[in-house]
């Protein structure tokens, strides 16, 4: 879902509403397969909303490249009920500088699998122009949250095996509960509005994965930034769409957020909270039982907010602490949905 070190992972939440119920009236007991491929390159560092231009100028910025493939299998039972299984795969790299020498760490494999049930609130037979779909699901900790690779010491040339950065871990280590709300309203047969809301609550506090290949300092231990947090995340998305023959054109806004504090449980451990507000143009081409689409959110506002360990360290030392995060300029989402 996200665009950089603010490590919001792919969840399949935006792909749940592949077809309006009014387009499937009378169809029961069929399958939808959705393949969504996402790519982004994060390299611009922010502290709050302020970009750290010197990082790119001095070429010591972190560069994340993330490729995620979501495979979603949806069983539509009738005009109102459906069940979705989402299986993500990721291929990630993180390039960073140590003592003037750039090196990269990598991760590859399956992410956190989720299962969600969905229900249209209004009867499609009588609610022709609009409807609201709600869904609840469970995200399982199937992705490796302690994926390891070799880190280079640029000064000595030594390599040390350790956990890769939180932003390229395959999972977060938590069993979470998700809420989806998807809605649309058609003013005409070709023009309408859409909206999506997704929230993932992760009650687990920390997952035990160390944040450094060296022994943590007393300060890190005191503020709990020595281990990775298991954060919540949410998405808000809305816009307008226009149908022209077999094409659907859309333009909207979206807010991807990893909050400072979780809805349930504690918010200890290291995380890079923040949000990205983006403009999102999209296009879908439909033929037969197949739909091809592309969406490219373009970042407008990027904000790396102060984390709980940052706040604690500020209180402990009397020196204001506010960590940074790397963000992308845009994200590319391309995919296909097939009805069986």
Locate predicted features.
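Cleavable N-terminal export/targeting peptides
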Residues: 1-15
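Short loop/turn motifs that connect adjacent beta-strands in outer-membrane beta-barrel proteins
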Residues: 2-6, 21-30, 44, 80, ...
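Surface-exposed strand-loop-strand hairpins of Gram-negative outer-membrane beta-barrel proteins
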Residues: 5, 39-68, 167
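Residues on the lipid-exposed face of transmembrane beta-strands in outer-membrane beta-barrel proteins
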Residues: 23, 35, 71-75, 85, ...
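Outer-membrane beta-barrel architecture
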Residues: 26-34, 82-87, 110-112, 127-135, ...
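Outer membrane beta-barrel transmembrane domains
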Residues: 46-57, 200, 205-340
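Short sequence motifs at beta-strands and strand-loop junctions characteristic
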Residues: 60-66, 106-111, 169-176, 228-232, ...
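Outer-membrane pore/translocation modules
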Residues: 91-229
């Amino acid at each position: 879902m996200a665009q950089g070190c603010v490590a919001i992972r792919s969840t399949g939440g935006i792909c749940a509403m592949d077809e309006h119920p009014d387009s499937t009236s009378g169809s029961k007991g069929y399958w939808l397969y959705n393949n969504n491929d996402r790519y982004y390159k994060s390299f611009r560092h922010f502290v709050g909303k302020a970009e750290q231009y010197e990082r790119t100028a001095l070429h010591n910025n972190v560069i994340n490249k993330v490729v995620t493939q979501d495979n979603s299998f949806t069983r539509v039972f009738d005009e109102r009920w459906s069940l979705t299984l989402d299986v993500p795969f990721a291929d990630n790299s993180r390039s960073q500088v140590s003592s003037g020498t750039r090196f990269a760490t990598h991760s590859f494999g399956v992410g956190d699998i989720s299962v969600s049930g969905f229900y249209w609130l209004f009867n499609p037979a009588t609610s022709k122009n609009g409807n609201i779909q709600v869904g609840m699901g469970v995200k399982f900790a199937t992705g490796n949250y302690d994926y390891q690779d070799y880190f280079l010491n640029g000064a000595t040339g030594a390599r040390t095996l350790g956990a890769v950065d939180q932003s390229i871990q395959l999972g977060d280590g938590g069993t979470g509960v998700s809420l989806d709300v998807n809605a649309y309203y058609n003013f005409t047969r070709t023009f309408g509005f859409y909206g999506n809301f997704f929230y993932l609550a992760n009650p687990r506090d920390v997952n035990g994965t160390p944040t450094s290949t060296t022994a943590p300092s007393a300060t890190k231990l005191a503020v709990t930034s020595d281990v990775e947090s298991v954060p919540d995340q949410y998405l808000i998305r809305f816009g307008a769409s226009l149908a022209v023959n077999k094409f659907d054109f859309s333009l909207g806004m979206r807010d991807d957020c990893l909050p400072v504090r979780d809805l349930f449980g504690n918010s200890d451990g290291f995380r890079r909270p923040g949000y990205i507000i983006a403009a999102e143009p999209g296009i879908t081409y439909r033929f037969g039982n197949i739909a091809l689409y592309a969406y490219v959110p373009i970042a407008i506002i990027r904000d790396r907010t102060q984390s709980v360990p940052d706040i604690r360290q500020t209180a402990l030392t009397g020196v204001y602490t506010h960590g940074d995060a790397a963000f992308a300029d845009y994200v590319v989402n391309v995919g296909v949905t097939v009805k069986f």
